[in-house]
Structures are given as structure tokens and as C-alpha cells.
Amino acid sequence: DDFRKDALATALHVYYINRKYPHAELSLSCPRLRPIVNNDRINPRDVGEKELCQVLCAYRIFLPFAGITVSSRESATFRNGIAKICATKVSAGVSTGIGDHEEKYECKKDDDVGDEQFEINDDRSFGKMYEDMEQGGLQPVLNDYIYV
């Protein structure tokens, strides 16, 4: 019931995994709850942007080797800022509708697509996100490995 305890337990778990499997690539994501269709019980305001920033910065300090992903559930302003501080990955041009991408690529009708799983807060396209990252002084990296 306290997000700080959950964050600490997660960090310790990642630390333990890293000690046991030092060559494993580890990454964290902290998707905050967003309003859910037909669900009034979950309060997405329990963890604000300030608290999320606190958790992500603590992860960066305690787990400097770990990747940190920030989803499109967060606002564009928050994602632009956190990318400069500690995030290593941000999503762009996403869809949360069940079957939504399939509909786009296979010309299915809208009525074949399910409800969105959660609301997106940052709906920037890939191109817009790339442009915003560059304008913010960051170098977007799309691929940081080579297949041999």
C-alpha cells in the first residue's frame, strides 16, 4: 500500500538478480496507473509525477547499470524532463487498444478492435518524439546493438 516499499523491494530484487547473474541485461519500468475503462476503484493519483521522479532517480543512483523505461502513460512534459535525468527508453506512437495495430495493418474494421487497456497521456508520433528529443539536446538512439 506504500509505493516506496514497492520501489525498494523492486530495487533490491534487481540488485540481487544482478549479483547472481552479472551478465544479464536488466531494465525497469514504473507504469503508473491511469484511468481504466469501467473501473472506478483504482485511483491513479496515488503516485504523482514528483513521487515517480523520486523513484526513478533513486533507481538510477542505486542501479546505474539498469535500463529505465518511461511509458506513454506519462505526460509529454514529464517524459521530456525525465529523459534528461535518468530514463534510457521512452515509447512513441503506441496504441493500447486490443487488436488496434492489427486493425491498422490488416485493414480490419473499428468494431473488431477492443477497448483501450489504459489511457495514453503522451500521444506523440515517433517522428514528433524524435524531433522533441533532438530539440531537447538529446541524441535519440534507435538501435544500440549489432547482430553478428
Question: Which role does the model predict for each range below?
Answer:
Residues 1-6:
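Canonical radical SAM enzyme core domain
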Residues 8, 18-148:
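Auxiliary Fe-S-binding modules of radical SAM enzymes
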Residues 9-13:
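Alpha-helical scaffold elements adjacent to nucleotide-binding pockets in ATP/GTP-utilizing enzyme cores
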